[in-house]
Swiss-Prot record:
Protein name, as recorded: Protein FAM210A
Keyword Aminoacyl-tRNA synthetase: no
Compartments where found: Membrane; Mitochondrion; Cytoplasm
This protein's UniProt keywords: Coiled coil, Cytoplasm, Membrane, Mitochondrion, Transmembrane, Transmembrane helix
Assigned GO CC terms: cytoplasm; membrane; mitochondrion
Transmembrane segments: 128-148
Basic and acidic residues: bias regions: 74-84
Main location (coarse class): membrane
Recorded superkingdom: Eukaryota
Membrane topology (UniProt): Single-pass membrane protein
Keyword Protein biosynthesis attached: no
Record function comment: May play a role in the structure and strength of both muscle and bone.
Length: 275
């Protein structure tokens, strides 16, 4: 009797395990639903009730661990809106025309360096500065060469001003002698040469303006604009001349065609009258 009761209970438990392996058991648990693929395998043996109880415990443990392993929903962070940066191109810039118009005369501008004054003066007064520079450079080099010919020893002076020993040794042991010494002094005196050239250019420009040989030069930008306008005017004149010639040719051709048509009409009307 006891064995039959146990056998019946084992069959009922075995049926319950077969019914609930792939369904969502333990639906009372809070949280997201667990995948339905989790199940249990039932092995038929001599003692099925114990196997079914072990399978049910394993199913419960797997579902509870899956529920606890899932993190809680965290609120999403909304990205903060950044203000657009102002581009560097929005900074107002001074137009080149205004900068050119505000440039002072390089001969009178003392705020820039000597080399910059020399370059700007060359750009603006090149026709006057080149002859002045050639004359002053010839005088400088000739004076140094004459001093070297007269036996002036410049080596102690070069050592005194701190010239490199390599250059001083070349001057001491040089075969050319006077020419090389004069050239070395010529290069050393570059600041003085530039100053004399600028002064000579300024005096020459004032003299030429005073006697009416030279007018005040316009800025480079205005000069280029004038040259472009002259070129534009010449091109416009050429185009107008070409247009006039083409118009004359077209009128001549039109007159000839009109004459031919008129002659043809006269011939046709004459034939009709004759007939």
């Amino acid at each position: 009797m006891q064995r039959s009761v146990l056998h019946t209970a084992s069959q009922l438990a075995h049926g319950m395990c077969l019914l609930f392996p792939r369904t969502g058991a333990f639906r009372g648990l809070k949280g997201p639903s667990v995948s339905s693929n989790v199940g249990c395998k039932v092995i038929l043996a001599l003692d099925p009730p114990k196997r079914c109880l072990h399978a049910g415990a394993a199913l419960f443990a797997s579902k509870s661990s899956a529920v606890s392993s899932q993190p809680a929903d965290t609120p999403r962070k909304v990205p903060e809106e950044r203000e657009p940066l102002t581009s560097a191109t929005e900074v107002p810039k001074q137009s080149p025309v205004e900068s050119d118009a505000s440039d002072p005369d390089p001969l009178q501008d003392k705020s820039i360096s000597l080399v910059q004054r020399f370059k700007k003066t060359f750009k603006q007064y090149g026709k006057v500065m080149i002859p002045v520079h050639l004359v002053t450079s010839t005088v400088w080099f000739g004076s140094f060469y004459y001093a070297a010919m007269k036996g002036v020893n410049v080596v102690p002076f070069l050592e005194l001003i701190g010239l490199p020993d390599s250059i001083v040794d070349i001057l001491k042991n040089s075969q050319s002698g006077n020419a090389l010494t004069a050239y070395a002094l010529y290069k050393i005196a570059t600041p003085a040469r530039y100053t004399v050239t600028l002064g000579g250019t300024s005096i020459t420009v004032k003299y030429l303006r005073k006697n009416g040989y030279m007018s005040t030069p316009p800025p480079v930008k205005e000069y280029l604009q004038d040259r472009m306008e002259e070129t534009k005017d010449k091109i416009t004149e050429k185009m107008e001349e070409t247009k006039d010639k083409i118009t004359e040719k077209m009128e001549e051709t039109k007159d000839k065609i009109t004459e031919k048509i008129q002659e043809t009409k006269d011939k046709v009307s004459f034939k009709k009258i004759k007939d």
